[in-house]
Protein backbone atom coordinates (compact mmCIF):
# COMPACT_ATOMS: atom_id res chain seq x y z
CA UNK A 1 0.00 0.00 0.00
CA UNK A 2 1.43 3.36 -0.98
CA UNK A 3 1.37 6.10 1.63
CA UNK A 4 2.34 9.73 1.08
CA UNK A 5 4.47 11.71 3.51
CA UNK A 6 4.11 15.48 3.61
CA UNK A 7 5.54 18.37 5.59
CA UNK A 8 3.77 19.84 8.60
CA UNK A 9 3.16 23.57 8.75
CA UNK A 10 3.06 24.76 12.39
CA UNK A 11 1.10 27.81 11.30
CA UNK A 12 -2.00 25.64 10.85
CA UNK A 13 -2.89 26.15 14.50
CA UNK A 14 -2.21 29.89 14.74
CA UNK A 15 -5.80 30.74 13.94
CA UNK A 16 -7.22 28.38 16.52
CA UNK A 17 -8.93 30.05 19.48
CA UNK A 18 -7.22 27.70 21.91
CA UNK A 19 -7.09 24.05 22.83
CA UNK A 20 -9.21 22.05 25.20
CA UNK A 21 -9.01 22.93 28.90
CA UNK A 22 -7.90 19.38 29.71
CA UNK A 23 -4.65 19.96 27.82
CA UNK A 24 -4.04 23.12 29.86
CA UNK A 25 -4.59 21.17 33.07
CA UNK A 26 -2.03 18.62 31.86
CA UNK A 27 0.58 21.27 31.05
CA UNK A 28 0.13 23.17 34.32
CA UNK A 29 0.36 19.98 36.34
CA UNK A 30 3.44 18.88 34.41
CA UNK A 31 5.14 22.25 34.99
CA UNK A 32 4.36 22.11 38.72
CA UNK A 33 5.75 18.58 38.92
CA UNK A 34 9.08 19.51 37.37
CA UNK A 35 9.44 22.81 39.24
CA UNK A 36 9.32 20.96 42.57
CA UNK A 37 11.50 18.05 41.53
CA UNK A 38 14.88 18.55 43.20
CA UNK A 39 17.19 16.63 40.90
CA UNK A 40 20.53 17.08 39.27
CA UNK A 41 19.89 17.57 35.57
CA UNK A 42 22.59 16.20 33.30
CA UNK A 43 20.91 16.61 29.93
CA UNK A 44 17.29 17.59 29.48
CA UNK A 45 15.15 15.59 27.11
CA UNK A 46 11.54 15.69 25.95
CA UNK A 47 11.44 12.03 27.02
CA UNK A 48 10.85 13.36 30.53
CA UNK A 49 7.24 14.11 29.51
CA UNK A 50 6.69 10.36 29.62
CA UNK A 51 7.89 9.98 33.20
CA UNK A 52 5.87 10.24 36.41
CA UNK A 53 2.47 11.44 35.24
CA UNK A 54 1.47 14.59 37.12
CA UNK A 55 -1.55 14.66 39.41
CA UNK A 56 -4.73 14.92 37.35
CA UNK A 57 -6.70 18.01 38.32
CA UNK A 58 -10.38 17.61 37.52
CA UNK A 59 -11.41 21.18 38.17
CA UNK A 60 -8.82 23.90 37.77
CA UNK A 61 -9.60 27.41 36.64
CA UNK A 62 -6.72 29.07 34.84
CA UNK A 63 -6.44 32.84 34.51
CA UNK A 64 -4.36 33.72 31.48
CA UNK A 65 -4.22 32.44 27.93
CA UNK A 66 -0.93 30.55 27.69
CA UNK A 67 -0.02 27.25 29.33
CA UNK A 68 3.28 26.95 31.13
CA UNK A 69 5.19 25.50 28.18
CA UNK A 70 8.27 27.57 28.97
CA UNK A 71 8.51 25.92 32.39
CA UNK A 72 8.44 22.33 31.16
CA UNK A 73 11.86 20.81 31.70
CA UNK A 74 13.31 18.93 28.76
CA UNK A 75 11.89 20.98 25.89
CA UNK A 76 14.09 22.89 23.46
CA UNK A 77 13.08 26.38 22.33
CA UNK A 78 11.51 25.02 19.15
CA UNK A 79 9.61 22.39 21.09
CA UNK A 80 8.31 25.05 23.49
CA UNK A 81 7.00 27.05 20.52
CA UNK A 82 5.21 23.96 19.23
CA UNK A 83 3.85 23.42 22.73
CA UNK A 84 2.31 26.92 22.66
CA UNK A 85 0.83 26.34 19.21
CA UNK A 86 -0.45 22.83 19.86
CA UNK A 87 -1.38 22.78 23.52
CA UNK A 88 -3.72 19.81 23.18
CA UNK A 89 -0.95 17.71 21.59
CA UNK A 90 1.39 17.69 24.58
CA UNK A 91 -0.43 15.03 26.56
CA UNK A 92 0.04 12.65 23.64
CA UNK A 93 3.70 13.57 23.24
CA UNK A 94 4.03 12.39 26.84
CA UNK A 95 2.06 9.23 26.13
CA UNK A 96 4.26 8.53 23.11
CA UNK A 97 7.42 8.97 25.18
CA UNK A 98 6.04 6.66 27.85
CA UNK A 99 5.13 4.03 25.24
CA UNK A 100 8.67 4.20 23.82
CA UNK A 101 10.30 3.90 27.24
CA UNK A 102 8.16 0.90 28.22
CA UNK A 103 8.86 -0.84 24.91
CA UNK A 104 12.59 -0.21 25.27
CA UNK A 105 12.52 -1.80 28.73
CA UNK A 106 10.60 -4.79 27.40
CA UNK A 107 12.94 -5.38 24.46
CA UNK A 108 16.07 -5.14 26.64
CA UNK A 109 14.75 -6.86 29.76
CA UNK A 110 17.19 -9.76 29.27
CA UNK A 111 20.20 -7.64 28.28
CA UNK A 112 23.02 -6.24 30.39
CA UNK A 113 21.75 -2.78 29.57
CA UNK A 114 18.03 -3.00 30.30
CA UNK A 115 16.93 0.53 29.40
CA UNK A 116 16.91 1.60 33.04
CA UNK A 117 15.69 5.11 33.78
CA UNK A 118 17.16 7.54 36.29
CA UNK A 119 15.45 10.10 38.49
CA UNK A 120 16.09 13.22 36.44
CA UNK A 121 14.96 14.79 33.19
CA UNK A 122 17.68 13.09 31.15
CA UNK A 123 15.52 9.96 31.75
CA UNK A 124 18.24 7.47 30.78
CA UNK A 125 21.22 9.25 32.33
CA UNK A 126 24.70 9.69 30.89
CA UNK A 127 24.54 6.53 28.82
CA UNK A 128 22.68 8.56 26.16
CA UNK A 129 25.70 10.86 25.79
CA UNK A 130 27.45 7.99 24.01
CA UNK A 131 26.45 7.46 20.38
CA UNK A 132 26.05 3.70 20.82
CA UNK A 133 23.62 1.28 19.22
CA UNK A 134 21.62 1.34 22.48
CA UNK A 135 21.23 5.10 22.11
CA UNK A 136 20.22 4.56 18.48
CA UNK A 137 17.43 2.20 19.51
CA UNK A 138 16.20 4.54 22.24
CA UNK A 139 15.88 7.50 19.87
CA UNK A 140 14.10 5.36 17.29
CA UNK A 141 11.58 3.74 19.62
CA UNK A 142 10.78 7.07 21.32
CA UNK A 143 10.08 8.78 17.99
CA UNK A 144 7.97 5.78 17.00
CA UNK A 145 5.99 6.10 20.23
CA UNK A 146 5.04 9.69 19.38
CA UNK A 147 3.82 8.73 15.89
CA UNK A 148 1.75 5.97 17.47
CA UNK A 149 0.17 8.19 20.14
CA UNK A 150 -0.54 11.16 17.85
CA UNK A 151 -2.07 9.00 15.10
CA UNK A 152 -4.45 7.37 17.55
CA UNK A 153 -5.35 10.65 19.25
CA UNK A 154 -6.41 12.04 15.86
CA UNK A 155 -8.66 9.07 15.23
CA UNK A 156 -10.24 9.37 18.67
CA UNK A 157 -11.04 13.06 18.13
CA UNK A 158 -8.76 14.29 20.91
CA UNK A 159 -6.90 16.90 18.84
CA UNK A 160 -8.15 20.16 17.34
CA UNK A 161 -6.14 20.02 14.10
CA UNK A 162 -6.72 16.48 12.85
CA UNK A 163 -9.30 13.73 12.63
CA UNK A 164 -9.69 10.32 11.02
CA UNK A 165 -7.20 9.17 8.40
CA UNK A 166 -7.60 10.53 4.87
CA UNK A 167 -5.31 7.93 3.35
CA UNK A 168 -6.12 7.02 -0.24
CA UNK A 169 -7.91 3.78 -0.97
CA UNK A 170 -5.37 0.99 -1.62
CA UNK A 171 -5.34 -0.09 -5.27
CA UNK A 172 -5.39 -3.77 -4.34
CA UNK A 173 -8.56 -3.48 -2.23
CA UNK A 174 -11.45 -5.45 -3.83
CA UNK A 175 -13.95 -3.19 -5.58
CA UNK A 176 -16.95 -4.28 -3.54
CA UNK A 177 -15.22 -3.46 -0.25
CA UNK A 178 -15.87 0.00 1.17
CA UNK A 179 -12.94 2.25 2.06
CA UNK A 180 -14.00 4.33 5.04
CA UNK A 181 -14.47 3.93 8.73
CA UNK A 182 -12.24 6.00 10.97
CA UNK A 183 -8.63 4.99 10.55
CA UNK A 184 -5.56 6.02 12.54
CA UNK A 185 -4.25 9.27 11.06
CA UNK A 186 -0.70 8.07 10.48
CA UNK A 187 0.12 10.85 8.00
CA UNK A 188 -0.54 13.51 10.63
CA UNK A 189 1.12 11.50 13.40
CA UNK A 190 4.24 11.09 11.28
CA UNK A 191 4.42 14.77 10.33
CA UNK A 192 3.90 16.16 13.81
CA UNK A 193 6.32 13.67 15.37
CA UNK A 194 8.96 14.73 12.84
CA UNK A 195 8.39 18.42 13.54
CA UNK A 196 8.46 18.04 17.33
CA UNK A 197 11.03 15.31 17.95
CA UNK A 198 13.59 16.61 15.43
CA UNK A 199 13.28 20.23 16.62
CA UNK A 200 16.02 19.90 19.25
CA UNK A 201 18.54 18.43 16.82
CA UNK A 202 17.83 21.01 14.12
CA UNK A 203 18.37 23.88 16.57
CA UNK A 204 21.84 22.69 17.54
CA UNK A 205 24.68 24.25 15.57
CA UNK A 206 28.17 22.75 15.69
CA UNK A 207 31.30 22.97 13.60
CA UNK A 208 31.30 20.82 10.49
CA UNK A 209 33.21 17.62 11.12
CA UNK A 210 32.84 17.80 14.91
CA UNK A 211 31.69 14.91 17.08
CA UNK A 212 28.61 16.91 18.01
CA UNK A 213 27.60 17.31 14.37
CA UNK A 214 27.96 13.55 13.89
CA UNK A 215 25.65 12.94 16.86
CA UNK A 216 23.04 15.28 15.39
CA UNK A 217 23.08 13.36 12.11
CA UNK A 218 22.93 10.06 13.96
CA UNK A 219 19.99 11.16 16.11
CA UNK A 220 18.04 12.52 13.13
CA UNK A 221 18.60 9.31 11.17
CA UNK A 222 17.40 7.10 14.03
CA UNK A 223 14.39 9.32 14.74
CA UNK A 224 13.37 8.87 11.11
CA UNK A 225 13.94 5.11 11.27
CA UNK A 226 11.54 4.88 14.20
CA UNK A 227 8.86 6.96 12.51
CA UNK A 228 9.08 5.04 9.23
CA UNK A 229 8.83 1.73 11.03
CA UNK A 230 5.45 2.73 12.46
CA UNK A 231 4.38 4.10 9.08
CA UNK A 232 5.38 1.05 7.09
CA UNK A 233 3.91 -1.48 9.51
CA UNK A 234 0.46 0.14 9.38
CA UNK A 235 -1.99 -2.05 7.51
CA UNK A 236 -5.57 -2.30 6.33
CA UNK A 237 -8.14 -3.53 8.85
CA UNK A 238 -11.67 -4.57 7.81
CA UNK A 239 -15.02 -5.27 9.42
CA UNK A 240 -17.66 -7.59 8.00
CA UNK A 241 -21.29 -6.63 7.45
CA UNK A 242 -24.12 -8.91 6.45
CA UNK A 243 -26.85 -11.19 7.72
CA UNK A 244 -25.70 -13.87 10.17
CA UNK A 245 -22.04 -13.04 9.64
CA UNK A 246 -22.18 -13.68 5.91
CA UNK A 247 -19.61 -10.93 5.33
CA UNK A 248 -21.29 -9.90 2.09
CA UNK A 249 -19.84 -6.42 2.58
CA UNK A 250 -16.65 -5.16 4.17
CA UNK A 251 -15.66 -1.72 5.43
CA UNK A 252 -11.90 -1.16 5.63
CA UNK A 253 -9.59 1.49 7.04
CA UNK A 254 -5.92 2.15 7.82
CA UNK A 255 -4.80 0.90 11.23
CA UNK A 256 -1.61 1.11 13.28
CA UNK A 257 0.23 -2.11 13.98
CA UNK A 258 0.44 -3.24 17.59
CA UNK A 259 3.38 -1.35 19.11
CA UNK A 260 5.04 -4.60 20.19
CA UNK A 261 5.44 -5.37 16.49
CA UNK A 262 7.16 -1.99 16.06
CA UNK A 263 9.46 -2.74 18.99
CA UNK A 264 10.32 -6.17 17.60
CA UNK A 265 11.17 -4.67 14.21
CA UNK A 266 13.39 -1.99 15.75
CA UNK A 267 15.11 -4.60 17.93
CA UNK A 268 16.05 -6.48 14.77
CA UNK A 269 17.42 -3.21 13.36
CA UNK A 270 19.40 -2.75 16.59
CA UNK A 271 21.04 -6.14 16.14
CA UNK A 272 22.13 -5.20 12.60
CA UNK A 273 22.84 -1.50 13.24
CA UNK A 274 25.54 0.10 11.05
CA UNK A 275 28.70 1.65 12.49
CA UNK A 276 29.19 5.10 10.96
CA UNK A 277 31.77 7.90 10.82
CA UNK A 278 31.91 11.43 9.44
CA UNK A 279 33.60 11.89 6.09
CA UNK A 280 35.44 15.02 4.93
CA UNK A 281 32.19 16.50 3.62
CA UNK A 282 30.49 16.23 7.00
CA UNK A 283 28.28 13.29 6.01
CA UNK A 284 27.83 10.01 7.83
CA UNK A 285 29.33 7.06 5.97
CA UNK A 286 29.78 3.44 6.97
CA UNK A 287 32.97 2.46 8.77
CA UNK A 288 33.06 -0.75 6.72
CA UNK A 289 32.41 0.22 3.10
CA UNK A 290 32.02 -3.44 2.06
CA UNK A 291 28.52 -3.51 3.53
CA UNK A 292 25.45 -2.01 1.90
CA UNK A 293 24.66 1.53 2.98
CA UNK A 294 21.97 1.72 5.68
CA UNK A 295 18.48 2.66 4.53
CA UNK A 296 16.23 5.23 6.19
CA UNK A 297 14.73 2.37 8.21
CA UNK A 298 18.04 1.04 9.55
CA UNK A 299 19.67 2.15 12.79
CA UNK A 300 23.12 3.74 12.85
CA UNK A 301 25.66 4.48 15.60
CA UNK A 302 29.03 6.23 15.86
CA UNK A 303 30.46 4.95 19.17
CA UNK A 304 31.12 1.46 20.53
CA UNK A 305 28.90 0.49 23.45
CA UNK A 306 30.35 1.03 26.93
CA UNK A 307 30.99 -1.88 29.29
CA UNK A 308 27.61 -2.57 30.86
CA UNK A 309 29.01 -5.25 33.17
CA UNK A 310 30.19 -2.88 35.89
CA UNK A 311 28.81 0.33 37.32
CA UNK A 312 30.52 3.38 35.85
CA UNK A 313 29.35 6.90 36.71
CA UNK A 314 31.19 8.49 33.79
CA UNK A 315 29.47 6.34 31.13
CA UNK A 316 26.16 5.96 32.95
CA UNK A 317 26.43 2.16 33.11
CA UNK A 318 24.56 0.74 36.12
CA UNK A 319 26.29 -2.64 35.91
CA UNK A 320 24.61 -6.01 36.33
CA UNK A 321 25.26 -6.64 40.02
CA UNK A 322 21.96 -7.61 41.65
CA UNK A 323 20.25 -8.48 38.35
CA UNK A 324 18.20 -11.66 38.13
CA UNK A 325 19.55 -14.26 35.73
CA UNK A 326 18.44 -17.58 34.27
CA UNK A 327 20.71 -20.42 35.35
CA UNK A 328 19.62 -22.74 32.55
CA UNK A 329 19.78 -20.26 29.67
CA UNK A 330 22.73 -19.91 27.31
CA UNK A 331 21.40 -16.58 26.01
CA UNK A 332 22.01 -13.03 27.21
CA UNK A 333 19.68 -13.61 30.17
CA UNK A 334 21.76 -16.59 31.31
CA UNK A 335 23.82 -16.22 34.47
CA UNK A 336 27.13 -16.72 32.65
CA UNK A 337 26.62 -13.81 30.26
CA UNK A 338 24.44 -11.56 32.41
CA UNK A 339 26.84 -11.75 35.36
CA UNK A 340 29.91 -11.26 33.13
CA UNK A 341 31.69 -14.25 34.67
CA UNK A 342 31.48 -12.91 38.26
CA UNK A 343 29.21 -15.71 39.42
CA UNK A 344 25.82 -15.53 41.06
CA UNK A 345 24.02 -16.08 44.34
CA UNK A 346 21.08 -18.42 44.76
CA UNK A 347 18.11 -17.82 47.04
CA UNK A 348 14.60 -19.11 47.50
CA UNK A 349 11.46 -17.05 47.22
CA UNK A 350 7.76 -17.72 47.70
CA UNK A 351 5.53 -17.02 44.71
CA UNK A 352 1.74 -16.89 44.89
CA UNK A 353 -0.32 -17.60 41.79
CA UNK A 354 -3.94 -18.22 40.85
CA UNK A 355 -4.58 -21.91 40.24
CA UNK A 356 -7.29 -24.58 39.90
CA UNK A 357 -9.60 -22.09 38.20
CA UNK A 358 -13.15 -23.27 37.47
CA UNK A 359 -15.96 -21.71 35.49
CA UNK A 360 -19.25 -21.47 37.40
CA UNK A 361 -22.65 -21.03 35.76
CA UNK A 362 -23.40 -18.23 35.31
CA UNK A 363 -21.01 -16.49 34.82
CA UNK A 364 -17.80 -16.22 36.76
CA UNK A 365 -14.47 -17.95 37.26
CA UNK A 366 -13.35 -18.96 40.73
CA UNK A 367 -9.70 -19.70 41.47
CA UNK A 368 -7.63 -20.87 44.38
CA UNK A 369 -4.31 -19.35 45.43
CA UNK A 370 -1.30 -21.61 45.24
CA UNK A 371 2.10 -20.88 46.75
CA UNK A 372 5.33 -22.29 45.43
CA UNK A 373 8.92 -22.02 46.60
CA UNK A 374 11.18 -21.30 43.64
CA UNK A 375 14.91 -20.82 43.19
CA UNK A 376 16.15 -17.48 41.91
CA UNK A 377 19.63 -16.43 40.88
CA UNK A 378 21.18 -12.99 41.23
CA UNK A 379 24.44 -11.71 39.78
CA UNK A 380 27.29 -11.03 42.20
Curated annotation (Swiss-Prot):
Question: Where is it localised?
Answer: Secreted, Extracellular space, Extracellular matrix; Secreted
SS bond list: 104-115, 154-162, 164-182, 238-252, 240-247, 309-340, 325-335, 339-379, 355-370, 357-367, 362-363
Q: How is it modified after translation?
A: Glycosylation is necessary for secretion but not for activity. Palmitoleoylation is required for efficient binding to frizzled receptors. Depalmitoleoylation leads to Wnt signaling pathway inhibition.
Query: What are its GO biological-process terms?
Result: anterior/posterior axis specification, embryo; atrial septum development; axon extension involved in axon guidance; axon guidance; BMP signaling pathway; canonical Wnt signaling pathway; cartilage development; cell fate commitment
Q: In which tissues is it expressed?
A: Expression is increased in differentiated thyroid carcinomas compared to normal thyroid tissue and anaplastic thyroid tumors where expression is low or undetectable. Expression is found in thyrocytes but not in stromal cells (at protein level). Detected in neonate heart and lung.
Q: Name one GO cellular component term.
A: Golgi lumen
Which SMART domains is this protein grouped with? WNT1
Which Pfam family is an annotated match for this chain, by its short name?
wnt
Glycosylated where? Answer: 114, 120, 312, 326
Mention one GO molecular function: receptor tyrosine kinase-like orphan receptor binding
Query: What InterPro entries does the database record attribute to this sequence?
Result: Wnt (IPR005817), Wnt_C (IPR043158), Wnt_CS (IPR018161)
Covalent lipidation (O-palmitoleoyl serine) residues? Answer: 244
Q: Which residues form the propeptide?
A: 36-61
Signal peptide residue numbers:
1-35
Keywords of this entry: Chondrogenesis, Developmental protein, Differentiation, Disease variant, Disulfide bond, Dwarfism, Extracellular matrix, Glycoprotein, Lipoprotein, Secreted, Signal, Wnt signaling pathway
Q: How does it assemble?
A: Forms a soluble 1:1 complex with AFM; this prevents oligomerization and is required for prolonged biological activity. The complex with AFM may represent the physiological form in body fluids. Homooligomer; disulfide-linked, leading to inactivation (in vitro). Interacts with PORCN. Interacts with WLS. Interacts with glypican GCP3. Interacts with PKD1 (via extracellular domain). Interacts with TMEM67.
Q: What is the protein's known function? A: Ligand for members of the frizzled family of seven transmembrane receptors. Can activate or inhibit canonical Wnt signaling, depending on receptor context. In the presence of FZD4, activates beta-catenin signaling. In the presence of ROR2, inhibits the canonical Wnt pathway by promoting beta-catenin degradation through a GSK3-independent pathway which involves down-regulation of beta-catenin-induced reporter gene expression. Suppression of the canonical pathway allows chondrogenesis to occur and inhibits tumor formation. Stimulates cell migration.
UniProt similarity note: Belongs to the Wnt family.
User: What disorder does this protein's entry note?
Assistant: Robinow syndrome, autosomal dominant 1: A disease characterized by short-limb dwarfism, costovertebral segmentation defects and abnormalities of the head, face and external genitalia. The clinical signs are generally milder in dominant cases.
User: Cross-referenced PANTHER family, in alphabetical order?
Assistant: PROTEIN WNT-5A, WNT RELATED
Protein known as: Protein Wnt-5a
What is the protein's species of origin? Homo sapiens
